[in-house]
Amino acid sequence: TYYTPEYQTKDTDILAAFRMTPQPGVPAEEAGAAVAAESSTGTWTTVWTDGLTSLDRYKGRCYDIEPVAGEENQYIAYVAYPLDLFEEGSVTNMLTSIVGNVFGFKALRALRLEDLRIPPAYSKTFIGPPHGIQVERDKLNKYGRPLLGCTIKPKLGLSAKNYGRAVYECLRGGLDFTKDDENVNSQPFMRWRDRFLFVAEALFKAQAETGEIKGHYLNATAGTCEEMMKRAVFARELGAPIVMHDYLTGGFTANTSLAYYCRDNGLLLHIHRAMHAVIDRQRNHGIHFRVLAKALRMSGGDHIHAGTVVGKLEGEREVTLGFVDLLRDDYIEKDRSRGIYFTQDWVSMPGVLPVASGGIHVWHMPALTEIFGDDSVLQFGGGTLGHPWGNAPGAVANRVASEACVQALNEGLR
Protein backbone atom coordinates (compact mmCIF):
# COMPACT_ATOMS: atom_id res chain seq x y z
CA THR A 1 0.00 0.00 0.00
CA TYR A 2 3.01 2.33 0.26
CA TYR A 3 3.90 1.95 -3.44
CA THR A 4 1.34 4.14 -5.23
CA PRO A 5 2.45 5.03 -8.78
CA GLU A 6 -0.93 6.67 -9.44
CA TYR A 7 -0.38 9.27 -6.66
CA GLN A 8 -0.34 12.93 -7.76
CA THR A 9 2.04 14.92 -5.54
CA LYS A 10 0.73 18.01 -3.76
CA ASP A 11 2.38 21.41 -3.52
CA THR A 12 2.58 20.93 0.25
CA ASP A 13 4.28 17.50 0.16
CA ILE A 14 7.92 17.09 1.12
CA LEU A 15 9.45 15.09 -1.73
CA ALA A 16 12.52 12.88 -1.36
CA ALA A 17 14.72 11.16 -3.95
CA PHE A 18 16.45 8.05 -2.57
CA ARG A 19 19.15 6.12 -4.44
CA MET A 20 18.47 2.57 -3.31
CA THR A 21 20.24 -0.73 -3.86
CA PRO A 22 17.86 -3.56 -2.89
CA GLN A 23 19.14 -6.89 -1.60
CA PRO A 24 19.30 -9.60 -4.30
CA GLY A 25 15.83 -10.95 -4.96
CA VAL A 26 13.99 -7.94 -3.50
CA PRO A 27 11.89 -6.19 -6.19
CA ALA A 28 12.45 -2.44 -6.56
CA GLU A 29 8.76 -1.72 -5.86
CA GLU A 30 8.91 -3.65 -2.59
CA ALA A 31 12.10 -1.84 -1.55
CA GLY A 32 10.61 1.57 -2.42
CA ALA A 33 7.46 0.78 -0.45
CA ALA A 34 9.60 -0.31 2.52
CA VAL A 35 11.49 3.01 2.44
CA ALA A 36 8.23 5.01 2.36
CA ALA A 37 6.70 2.91 5.14
CA GLU A 38 9.66 2.90 7.53
CA SER A 39 10.23 6.66 7.14
CA SER A 40 6.55 7.45 7.83
CA THR A 41 3.76 5.40 9.46
CA GLY A 42 4.83 1.80 8.83
CA THR A 43 6.33 -0.84 11.10
CA TRP A 44 7.31 -4.48 10.55
CA THR A 45 3.80 -5.84 11.12
CA THR A 46 0.17 -4.75 11.11
CA VAL A 47 -0.81 -3.37 14.53
CA TRP A 48 -4.35 -3.04 15.88
CA THR A 49 -3.90 0.70 16.58
CA ASP A 50 -3.65 1.26 12.80
CA GLY A 51 -7.44 1.30 12.93
CA LEU A 52 -7.47 4.30 15.28
CA THR A 53 -6.06 6.76 12.74
CA SER A 54 -6.20 7.49 9.03
CA LEU A 55 -3.06 5.90 7.61
CA ASP A 56 -4.08 7.07 4.16
CA ARG A 57 -3.78 10.65 5.32
CA TYR A 58 -0.44 10.33 7.09
CA LYS A 59 1.58 7.70 5.22
CA GLY A 60 4.54 8.37 2.95
CA ARG A 61 4.05 7.19 -0.61
CA CYS A 62 6.62 5.87 -3.07
CA TYR A 63 5.13 7.35 -6.24
CA ASP A 64 7.85 6.63 -8.80
CA ILE A 65 10.87 4.38 -9.29
CA GLU A 66 13.44 4.72 -12.05
CA PRO A 67 16.55 2.62 -12.71
CA VAL A 68 19.91 4.41 -12.46
CA ALA A 69 21.60 4.43 -15.88
CA GLY A 70 24.81 2.42 -15.98
CA GLU A 71 24.31 0.86 -12.54
CA GLU A 72 23.15 -2.68 -11.88
CA ASN A 73 20.29 -3.15 -9.40
CA GLN A 74 20.22 0.54 -8.42
CA TYR A 75 17.13 2.74 -8.50
CA ILE A 76 15.93 6.23 -7.65
CA ALA A 77 12.82 5.94 -5.48
CA TYR A 78 10.68 9.08 -5.18
CA VAL A 79 8.74 9.39 -1.93
CA ALA A 80 6.12 12.01 -0.99
CA TYR A 81 5.48 12.84 2.67
CA PRO A 82 2.43 14.76 3.88
CA LEU A 83 3.34 17.94 5.75
CA ASP A 84 1.51 16.90 8.93
CA LEU A 85 4.21 14.31 9.64
CA PHE A 86 6.72 17.03 10.61
CA GLU A 87 7.08 19.54 13.43
CA GLU A 88 7.22 23.11 12.20
CA GLY A 89 10.64 24.77 12.32
CA SER A 90 12.51 21.60 13.33
CA VAL A 91 15.24 20.24 11.04
CA THR A 92 15.92 17.72 13.80
CA ASN A 93 12.43 16.24 13.52
CA MET A 94 12.44 16.32 9.71
CA LEU A 95 15.67 14.33 9.46
CA THR A 96 14.71 11.98 12.29
CA SER A 97 11.64 11.01 10.28
CA ILE A 98 13.11 10.84 6.78
CA VAL A 99 16.54 9.31 7.47
CA GLY A 100 16.16 8.07 11.04
CA ASN A 101 15.68 4.28 10.92
CA VAL A 102 15.32 3.37 7.30
CA PHE A 103 19.05 3.25 6.46
CA GLY A 104 19.50 0.07 8.49
CA PHE A 105 16.64 -1.72 6.73
CA LYS A 106 17.29 -5.40 5.92
CA ALA A 107 15.67 -5.27 2.47
CA LEU A 108 18.31 -2.76 1.31
CA ARG A 109 22.02 -3.21 0.64
CA ALA A 110 22.52 0.55 0.47
CA LEU A 111 20.45 3.73 0.56
CA ARG A 112 21.34 7.35 -0.14
CA LEU A 113 19.14 10.42 0.19
CA GLU A 114 19.98 12.40 -2.96
CA ASP A 115 17.63 15.38 -2.67
CA LEU A 116 14.64 16.86 -0.84
CA ARG A 117 11.98 19.26 -2.10
CA ILE A 118 10.99 21.52 0.80
CA PRO A 119 7.64 23.21 0.06
CA PRO A 120 7.23 26.91 0.96
CA ALA A 121 4.46 25.92 3.39
CA TYR A 122 7.17 24.19 5.45
CA SER A 123 10.25 26.32 4.75
CA LYS A 124 8.38 29.44 5.96
CA THR A 125 8.25 27.92 9.47
CA PHE A 126 12.08 28.06 9.78
CA ILE A 127 14.34 30.90 10.92
CA GLY A 128 16.70 30.46 7.95
CA PRO A 129 19.98 32.41 7.86
CA PRO A 130 20.15 34.93 10.73
CA HIS A 131 20.93 37.77 8.28
CA GLY A 132 21.66 36.59 4.73
CA ILE A 133 23.95 37.81 1.97
CA GLN A 134 22.68 41.35 1.42
CA VAL A 135 22.47 42.23 5.12
CA GLU A 136 25.99 40.87 5.66
CA ARG A 137 27.36 43.04 2.85
CA ASP A 138 25.60 46.06 4.35
CA LYS A 139 27.02 45.31 7.81
CA LEU A 140 30.55 44.96 6.42
CA ASN A 141 30.17 47.74 3.80
CA LYS A 142 31.85 45.47 1.23
CA TYR A 143 30.39 45.01 -2.24
CA GLY A 144 31.25 43.74 -5.71
CA ARG A 145 33.86 41.13 -4.84
CA PRO A 146 34.26 37.82 -3.01
CA LEU A 147 35.13 38.14 0.67
CA LEU A 148 38.54 36.78 1.68
CA GLY A 149 39.30 34.64 4.71
CA CYS A 150 42.04 32.61 6.34
CA THR A 151 42.02 29.73 8.81
CA ILE A 152 44.71 30.28 11.44
CA LYS A 153 47.35 27.52 11.37
CA PRO A 154 48.73 25.49 13.03
CA LYS A 155 45.18 24.63 13.95
CA LEU A 156 46.18 23.40 17.42
CA GLY A 157 48.99 24.31 19.80
CA LEU A 158 49.29 28.11 19.59
CA SER A 159 48.94 30.21 22.73
CA ALA A 160 46.15 32.78 22.74
CA LYS A 161 48.59 35.68 22.37
CA ASN A 162 50.42 34.17 19.38
CA TYR A 163 47.06 33.24 17.88
CA GLY A 164 45.90 36.86 18.17
CA ARG A 165 49.13 38.02 16.53
CA ALA A 166 48.49 35.79 13.49
CA VAL A 167 44.92 37.13 13.28
CA TYR A 168 46.16 40.73 13.32
CA GLU A 169 48.79 40.14 10.62
CA CYS A 170 46.30 38.51 8.25
CA LEU A 171 43.61 41.16 8.72
CA ARG A 172 46.13 43.99 8.52
CA GLY A 173 47.37 42.53 5.22
CA GLY A 174 43.95 42.88 3.60
CA LEU A 175 41.78 39.88 4.45
CA ASP A 176 38.17 40.41 5.54
CA PHE A 177 38.00 37.47 7.93
CA THR A 178 40.16 35.07 9.85
CA LYS A 179 38.83 31.83 11.28
CA ASP A 180 39.14 29.45 14.18
CA ASP A 181 39.77 25.95 12.93
CA GLU A 182 36.85 23.64 13.63
CA ASN A 183 39.06 21.70 16.10
CA VAL A 184 39.64 24.80 18.22
CA ASN A 185 37.17 24.95 21.12
CA SER A 186 38.67 25.38 24.60
CA GLN A 187 41.75 23.22 25.09
CA PRO A 188 44.48 23.33 27.76
CA PHE A 189 46.92 25.21 25.49
CA MET A 190 44.35 27.95 24.72
CA ARG A 191 41.13 28.45 26.67
CA TRP A 192 38.28 30.02 24.74
CA ARG A 193 38.03 33.21 26.81
CA ASP A 194 41.72 34.01 26.37
CA ARG A 195 41.45 33.43 22.62
CA PHE A 196 38.36 35.65 22.33
CA LEU A 197 40.11 38.51 24.18
CA PHE A 198 43.33 38.45 22.12
CA VAL A 199 41.38 38.06 18.87
CA ALA A 200 39.14 41.03 19.74
CA GLU A 201 42.25 43.15 20.36
CA ALA A 202 43.65 42.07 16.97
CA LEU A 203 40.34 42.85 15.24
CA PHE A 204 40.07 46.39 16.56
CA LYS A 205 43.73 47.16 15.89
CA ALA A 206 43.44 45.95 12.27
CA GLN A 207 40.18 47.89 11.80
CA ALA A 208 41.72 51.09 13.10
CA GLU A 209 44.72 50.78 10.79
CA THR A 210 42.87 49.77 7.60
CA GLY A 211 39.59 51.65 7.94
CA GLU A 212 37.74 48.42 6.99
CA ILE A 213 35.39 46.30 9.06
CA LYS A 214 37.10 43.04 9.98
CA GLY A 215 35.86 39.77 11.46
CA HIS A 216 37.13 36.57 13.01
CA TYR A 217 34.96 33.46 13.20
CA LEU A 218 35.02 32.83 16.95
CA ASN A 219 34.12 29.16 17.35
CA ALA A 220 31.32 28.95 19.92
CA THR A 221 30.91 25.17 19.52
CA ALA A 222 30.99 23.51 22.95
CA GLY A 223 30.05 20.37 24.85
CA THR A 224 26.67 21.76 25.95
CA CYS A 225 24.20 24.22 24.46
CA GLU A 226 24.48 26.38 27.58
CA GLU A 227 28.26 26.67 27.21
CA MET A 228 27.88 27.42 23.48
CA MET A 229 25.47 30.27 24.24
CA LYS A 230 27.79 31.62 26.94
CA ARG A 231 30.58 31.89 24.36
CA ALA A 232 28.31 33.58 21.81
CA VAL A 233 27.18 36.10 24.44
CA PHE A 234 30.81 36.90 25.34
CA ALA A 235 31.67 37.38 21.65
CA ARG A 236 28.81 39.88 21.32
CA GLU A 237 29.91 41.72 24.48
CA LEU A 238 33.41 42.08 23.00
CA GLY A 239 31.92 43.65 19.87
CA ALA A 240 32.86 40.78 17.53
CA PRO A 241 30.75 40.76 14.34
CA ILE A 242 30.63 36.97 13.74
CA VAL A 243 30.69 33.63 15.55
CA MET A 244 31.08 30.09 14.27
CA HIS A 245 29.46 26.70 14.82
CA ASP A 246 30.23 23.13 13.73
CA TYR A 247 26.66 22.27 12.78
CA LEU A 248 26.90 18.53 12.21
CA THR A 249 28.95 17.65 15.29
CA GLY A 250 27.12 20.28 17.36
CA GLY A 251 23.70 19.20 16.12
CA PHE A 252 20.77 20.94 14.43
CA THR A 253 18.96 21.79 17.68
CA ALA A 254 22.02 23.64 19.00
CA ASN A 255 22.55 25.27 15.61
CA THR A 256 19.02 26.65 15.37
CA SER A 257 19.21 27.95 18.96
CA LEU A 258 22.43 29.79 18.09
CA ALA A 259 20.92 31.14 14.86
CA TYR A 260 18.03 32.70 16.80
CA TYR A 261 20.50 34.34 19.21
CA CYS A 262 22.60 35.66 16.30
CA ARG A 263 19.58 37.18 14.56
CA ASP A 264 18.35 38.85 17.75
CA ASN A 265 21.78 40.25 18.60
CA GLY A 266 23.24 41.28 15.25
CA LEU A 267 25.89 38.54 15.02
CA LEU A 268 26.72 36.85 11.73
CA LEU A 269 26.93 33.05 11.91
CA HIS A 270 29.64 31.07 10.10
CA ILE A 271 28.98 27.35 9.74
CA HIS A 272 31.60 24.65 9.42
CA ARG A 273 30.60 21.23 8.09
CA ALA A 274 33.06 19.04 10.06
CA MET A 275 32.02 15.36 9.76
CA HIS A 276 30.10 15.85 6.50
CA ALA A 277 32.23 13.38 4.51
CA VAL A 278 31.31 10.59 6.95
CA ILE A 279 27.71 11.14 5.84
CA ASP A 280 27.99 12.24 2.21
CA ARG A 281 31.13 10.78 0.60
CA GLN A 282 29.90 7.28 -0.25
CA ARG A 283 28.13 7.38 -3.60
CA ASN A 284 25.62 4.66 -2.77
CA HIS A 285 24.91 5.16 0.93
CA GLY A 286 24.33 8.14 3.22
CA ILE A 287 23.03 11.64 2.53
CA HIS A 288 24.20 13.88 -0.32
CA PHE A 289 25.66 17.23 0.77
CA ARG A 290 22.97 19.11 -1.17
CA VAL A 291 20.47 17.81 1.42
CA LEU A 292 22.75 18.82 4.31
CA ALA A 293 23.10 22.26 2.67
CA LYS A 294 19.31 22.69 2.41
CA ALA A 295 18.95 21.57 6.03
CA LEU A 296 21.53 24.17 7.09
CA ARG A 297 19.80 26.95 5.16
CA MET A 298 16.62 26.17 7.11
CA SER A 299 18.36 25.67 10.46
CA GLY A 300 20.29 28.94 10.15
CA GLY A 301 23.73 30.06 9.02
CA ASP A 302 25.15 32.99 7.04
CA HIS A 303 28.20 31.13 5.65
CA ILE A 304 28.82 27.44 5.05
CA HIS A 305 31.80 25.54 3.66
CA ALA A 306 30.80 24.16 0.27
CA GLY A 307 33.92 22.63 -1.30
CA THR A 308 36.31 24.24 -3.75
CA VAL A 309 36.26 22.28 -7.04
CA VAL A 310 40.00 23.05 -7.32
CA GLY A 311 41.65 22.44 -3.91
CA LYS A 312 42.64 19.45 -1.75
CA LEU A 313 39.08 18.33 -0.88
CA GLU A 314 36.80 16.38 -3.17
CA GLY A 315 34.11 18.18 -5.17
CA GLU A 316 32.73 17.78 -8.70
CA ARG A 317 32.24 21.07 -10.49
CA GLU A 318 28.63 20.84 -11.74
CA VAL A 319 27.33 19.11 -8.63
CA THR A 320 29.13 21.60 -6.37
CA LEU A 321 27.68 24.54 -8.31
CA GLY A 322 24.26 22.91 -7.99
CA PHE A 323 24.28 23.04 -4.21
CA VAL A 324 25.97 26.46 -4.23
CA ASP A 325 22.88 27.70 -6.11
CA LEU A 326 20.64 25.90 -3.60
CA LEU A 327 22.40 27.86 -0.85
CA ARG A 328 22.35 31.30 -2.51
CA ASP A 329 19.37 31.59 -4.86
CA ASP A 330 15.64 32.07 -4.25
CA TYR A 331 14.41 29.71 -6.96
CA ILE A 332 16.37 26.77 -8.37
CA GLU A 333 15.06 24.76 -11.32
CA LYS A 334 15.27 20.99 -11.46
CA ASP A 335 18.45 20.02 -13.33
CA ARG A 336 19.51 16.39 -13.20
CA SER A 337 22.88 17.14 -14.83
CA ARG A 338 23.75 19.07 -11.65
CA GLY A 339 22.17 16.51 -9.34
CA ILE A 340 19.10 18.67 -8.62
CA TYR A 341 16.13 16.30 -8.58
CA PHE A 342 13.42 18.83 -7.69
CA THR A 343 12.65 22.47 -8.35
CA GLN A 344 13.23 24.30 -5.06
CA ASP A 345 11.43 27.56 -4.21
CA TRP A 346 12.83 29.25 -1.08
CA VAL A 347 10.43 32.22 -1.50
CA SER A 348 11.87 34.99 0.70
CA MET A 349 14.35 32.98 2.79
CA PRO A 350 17.75 34.78 2.75
CA GLY A 351 20.69 33.10 1.02
CA VAL A 352 23.84 31.61 2.53
CA LEU A 353 27.34 32.58 1.36
CA PRO A 354 29.25 29.50 0.16
CA VAL A 355 32.79 29.25 1.54
CA ALA A 356 35.52 27.76 -0.66
CA SER A 357 38.20 26.37 1.62
CA GLY A 358 40.74 23.56 1.61
CA GLY A 359 44.10 23.49 -0.16
CA ILE A 360 43.55 26.63 -2.22
CA HIS A 361 46.13 29.36 -2.79
CA VAL A 362 46.70 32.52 -4.79
CA TRP A 363 47.18 30.71 -8.12
CA HIS A 364 43.65 29.32 -7.81
CA MET A 365 42.18 32.84 -7.61
CA PRO A 366 41.18 33.22 -11.31
CA ALA A 367 39.36 29.87 -11.27
CA LEU A 368 37.71 30.55 -7.90
CA THR A 369 36.39 34.00 -8.85
CA GLU A 370 35.01 32.56 -12.08
CA ILE A 371 33.41 29.51 -10.43
CA PHE A 372 31.94 31.12 -7.30
CA GLY A 373 31.39 34.72 -8.40
CA ASP A 374 31.09 37.70 -6.06
CA ASP A 375 28.77 36.20 -3.45
CA SER A 376 31.23 33.84 -1.81
CA VAL A 377 33.99 33.65 0.77
CA LEU A 378 37.37 32.41 -0.48
CA GLN A 379 39.35 31.07 2.42
CA PHE A 380 43.11 30.51 2.25
CA GLY A 381 44.72 28.97 5.35
CA GLY A 382 48.03 27.53 4.22
CA GLY A 383 47.55 29.72 1.14
CA THR A 384 48.06 32.78 3.35
CA LEU A 385 50.20 31.60 6.26
CA GLY A 386 52.45 29.54 3.97
CA HIS A 387 53.74 32.62 2.13
CA PRO A 388 57.57 32.63 2.26
CA TRP A 389 57.61 36.24 3.50
CA GLY A 390 55.10 35.74 6.32
CA ASN A 391 51.43 36.10 7.20
CA ALA A 392 50.82 39.73 6.23
CA PRO A 393 52.46 39.42 2.77
CA GLY A 394 50.40 36.26 2.24
CA ALA A 395 47.24 38.23 2.96
CA VAL A 396 48.37 41.07 0.67
CA ALA A 397 48.99 38.58 -2.15
CA ASN A 398 45.48 37.17 -1.84
CA ARG A 399 43.83 40.60 -1.70
CA VAL A 400 45.77 41.89 -4.72
CA ALA A 401 45.03 38.73 -6.72
CA SER A 402 41.33 38.89 -5.82
CA GLU A 403 40.96 42.53 -6.86
CA ALA A 404 42.90 41.92 -10.09
CA CYS A 405 40.62 39.00 -11.01
CA VAL A 406 37.46 40.97 -10.22
CA GLN A 407 38.73 43.91 -12.29
CA ALA A 408 39.52 41.57 -15.20
CA LEU A 409 36.01 40.10 -15.06
CA ASN A 410 34.40 43.55 -14.84
CA GLU A 411 36.39 44.84 -17.81
CA GLY A 412 35.68 41.77 -19.93
CA LEU A 413 39.31 40.71 -20.07
CA ARG A 414 38.46 37.08 -19.20
From Swiss-Prot:
One of its GO terms (cellular component) is chloroplast. The basic functional RuBisCO is composed of a large chain homodimer in a 'head-to-tail' conformation. In form I RuBisCO this homodimer is arranged in a barrel-like tetramer with the small subunits forming a tetrameric 'cap' on each end of the 'barrel'. RuBisCO catalyzes two reactions: the carboxylation of D-ribulose 1,5-bisphosphate, the primary event in carbon dioxide fixation, as well as the oxidative fragmentation of the pentose substrate in the photorespiration process. Both reactions occur simultaneously and in competition at the same active site. It comes from the Eukaryota. Mg(2+) binds at K179, D181, E182. Belongs to the RuBisCO large chain family. Type I subfamily. Pfam families: RuBisCO_large, RuBisCO_large_N. InterPro entries: RuBisCO, RuBisCo_large_chain_AS, RuBisCO_lsu_C, RuBisCO_lsu_C_sf, RuBisCO_lsu_fd_N, RuBisCO_lsu_N_sf. It comes from Onychium japonicum (Japanese claw fern). The active site is at K153, H272. It catalyses: 2 (2R)-3-phosphoglycerate + 2 H(+) = D-ribulose 1,5-bisphosphate + CO2 + H2O; D-ribulose 1,5-bisphosphate + O2 = 2-phosphoglycolate + (2R)-3-phosphoglycerate + 2 H(+). The record marks K312 as: Transition state stabilizer. Its cofactor is Mg(2+). This is Ribulose bisphosphate carboxylase large chain. Keywords: Calvin cycle, Carbon dioxide fixation, Chloroplast, Disulfide bond, Lyase, Magnesium, Metal-binding, Monooxygenase, Oxidoreductase, Photorespiration, Photosynthesis, Plastid. The disulfide bond which can form in the large chain dimeric partners within the hexadecamer appears to be associated with oxidative stress and protein turnover. It is found in: Plastid, Chloroplast. One of its GO terms (biological process) is photorespiration. GO terms for molecular function: magnesium ion binding; monooxygenase activity; ribulose-bisphosphate carboxylase activity. Its EC number is 4.1.1.39. Binds 1 Mg(2+) ion per subunit. Heterohexadecamer of 8 large chains and 8 small chains; disulfide-linked. The disulfide link is formed within the large subunit homodimers. The keyword Iron does not apply. Substrate binds at N101, T151, K155, R273, H305, S357. The modification N6-carboxylysine is found at K179. Gene3D superfamilies: Ribulose bisphosphate carboxylase, large subunit, C-terminal domain (3.20.20.110), RuBisCO large subunit, N-terminal domain (3.30.70.150).
